[in-house]
Each structure stands twice: as structure tokens, then as C-alpha cells.
Amino acid sequence: MNKKKKVIIAISGGVDSSVSAWFLKKSGYHVEGVFMKNWEEINSSIKCTFKKDLKDAQIVCDQIGININIVNFSEQYWNKVFKIFLREYKIGNTPNPDILCNKEIKFKYFLNFAIKEMQADYIATGHYVRKINFNGKSQLFSAFDLKKDQSYFLHQINYKELSKCIFPIGNILKSKVRYIASKLNLITSKKRDSTGICFIGNKNFNKFIKNYLHDDPGLIFSTEKKQIGTHKGLMYYTIGQRKGLNIKKIYYNCHDPWYVVDKKIDKNYLIVSQGKNNPYLMSTSIIIIETNWIDQIYLKNPIKCMVKTRYRQNSTLCLVIPIDKKSIEVIFYKPISSVAPGQYAVFYLLDRCLGGGIIKSRKLVIDK
């Protein structure tokens, strides 16, 4: 008699991981859940949704009929994710902690814990992505439900890690996930999807970040070098942002809103310009560092592919030119708006995610 394959699923207390767990058990795997605690509520004014999510996870595992384990990765999260998050904000970048969390916590610490400590054959998550064997390696592909596709957030893992992963809902629509959860009467069937940064929860970002970084107010200048306001601290703004600038109407040259187009870290200046498609927002190329190729084969020659420089963005055609093993230049066939250093550029060939890296710098339309 063949022994059942053991799968440890990351149970978050949400509908996606709940239905994923049900699919796995229905498919005949020996399934156990792990609820990861990645954040310690040191400051009582900062409430994460940990307790509510844990309770929902425990109830849903009981409904499905699987055991649940609680594993604390908060120390690893602090050192490998949150410290980097703070460091990047401090120097004016716009980091993405969810990508770091997937890279360092879910698909490294959790994966190793499940395989070594729990003798699992695989781990599973409720991510909307697909894993397909391609050229003899496990590769990452966009989800069937493109509106929910999360391959952008998983591009930092590699084919070896992918080979140990199962994504049960990558081939179905989100609406069907909700439908299945409702038919099973799972407690999470009507639970809202989590949004924003996990350790902030429903709290205001500005209030949260003040607990860790000091405000450093400064001046706002237009691209014409005219002082037109003050800012609360560069860490509160990102390239392409239009809300929260509070620029007085007397400084408007037209009806177009003001947008953040640059940060002068050395002088603590915030630079703004009017119009969504103004040349100070439009980039023709970018430099990427810490590039990860999922198949772990480094580029030797330029390739033409599609790229996203932020999650909710249509991919655009580009030419990728290798500089060294971890650095590349990306030339856009058409200029794109609001590229933010510190964010990630992620590359695709059709629906296959090739990998990506951190945006170090950009070349604007106006640059010679």
C-alpha cells in the first residue's frame, strides 16, 4: 500500500487557504495546517489581526478535519523582512515587504520547517499562481484568474523551492473559491480578503511608521525649482503619488493635479510636477539589482519580454540587457509612468514568470 504524501498547508484564516486545504484533503493527501505568527504585538497601539485570523484558522481546520499547528517566525520576519522595510523607507525607497515575506519566510523558513521538522513531502499555500514543469524544472505561471494573479509576489523564489510547492487554487476563479467555501459552510466563506501590509493591518500607515522612524519634515519644490509647500517626511511619499500633498490652489498652473516625481534625499526635498503623464514621471529605462531568475540560469544575452514595475499594472514590452549575474538594464519600448526605486520589476514570457529584481534607478524621458 502506498503511503499518502504529506502536505503542510499555510493556513492564514482566509478563504483562499481554507479552500486550498479542502482541495488537498479531497485529493487524498495527508494534510496538516500551519498558522504562521510573523509579528509580535509589542506596542498595544498597533493591533494586527492575529487573534481573529488564528481563531478562524482553527475553526476552519476543525471543519475540514485536519490538525493545525502554530509556528512563530516573528524573529525571522523582524530580521529578514521588517528591518529591510525600515531601511529602505529611511533612504526614500518604496519597498514591498510582501515579496520579501514570500522569499524569506513562506518559501524558505516555513518550507524548511515543514520538510525537516514535520517530514512533509510538500507545502501548499492559497496563492493564485500555477506551477508547471517546463524544460525539466518547476516554473511559475500566472493564475487562471488573471485578476487575482499573484505571480508578481512570488517571483523571488526558485525552481527548487517551487518543486516542493502545491498551489491548489491556481487553476480556478476566485468566484468559484467563494462558491466552494459557501457550499462547505466554511467560516471564512464571506471573510474579506486581506489588503495592505500584513503587520500594519487596518491601522493608518503614517501612524504606524512613526513608531519606528522619526518624522523629518521638509520643503516641496516644483520641477521649476519653486517652493510650493512642505512635506511631513519623505518616507510618507512615493513616486507617482498625488494624494496628501496639500499644495495650495495659488500654485496650480492648470487644472491637472500635482504628482510626486522625485525625492532629493540629501536636501530632504520632495519634487512635484503637474499632470499624470508629465515627462518627469515617464521612464525610458531602469537598472535592476538583486535579480532572481526562477530557473537559476543567468542571462548571457539580451532578451525581449514583458515587464511589470508594480503589481496592479499591465505588462509592457521591454529589452533586458545583462550587466552582471545580479544586475540588468531594462529598456522599455514605450515610456512608462511612476517607476519607484525600491519596488520590484518582474518579467514574463506570455504567462510564465521568469523572475525579477529591485529597481535601483530610472532614466527619464527628459534625461539626455
From Swiss-Prot:
One GO BP: tRNA wobble position uridine thiolation
Subcellular location: Cytoplasm
Region ranges (Interaction with target base in tRNA): 96-98
Residues annotated for ATP binding in this entry: 10-17, 36, 126
Feature type site, description Interaction with tRNA: 127, 343
EC number(s) reported in the record: 2.8.1.13
Highest taxon, organism lineage: Bacteria
Disulfides per UniProt: 101-198
Class in the EC hierarchy, top level: transferase
GO CC terms in record: cytoplasm
CDD domains found in the cross-reference section: MnmA_TRMU-like
Pfam families: tRNA_Me_trans, tRNA_Me_trans_C, tRNA_Me_trans_M
Catalytic activity: S-sulfanyl-L-cysteinyl-[protein] + uridine(34) in tRNA + AH2 + ATP = 2-thiouridine(34) in tRNA + L-cysteinyl-[protein] + A + AMP + diphosphate + H(+)
Molecular function (Gene Ontology), one example: ATP binding
List of catalytic residues: 101, 198
Region (Interaction with tRNA): 148-150, 310-311
Assigned keywords, A-Z: ATP-binding, Cytoplasm, Disulfide bond, Nucleotide-binding, RNA-binding, Transferase, tRNA processing, tRNA-binding
Function: Catalyzes the 2-thiolation of uridine at the wobble position (U34) of tRNA(Lys), tRNA(Glu) and tRNA(Gln), leading to the formation of s(2)U34, the first step of tRNA-mnm(5)s(2)U34 synthesis. Sulfur is provided by IscS, via a sulfur-relay system. Binds ATP and its substrate tRNAs.
UniProt similarity note: Belongs to the MnmA/TRMU family.
PANTHER family named in the record: MITOCHONDRIAL TRNA-SPECIFIC 2-THIOURIDYLASE 1, TRNA 5-METHYLAMINOMETHYL-2-THIOURIDYLATE -METHYLTRANSFERASE
Quaternary structure (record): Interacts with TusE.
Entries under NCBIfam families matching the protein: PRK00143.1, trmU
Name under which the protein is recorded: tRNA-specific 2-thiouridylase MnmA
Originating organism: Wigglesworthia glossinidia brevipalpis
Taxonomic path: Bacteria, Pseudomonadati, Pseudomonadota, Gammaproteobacteria, Enterobacterales
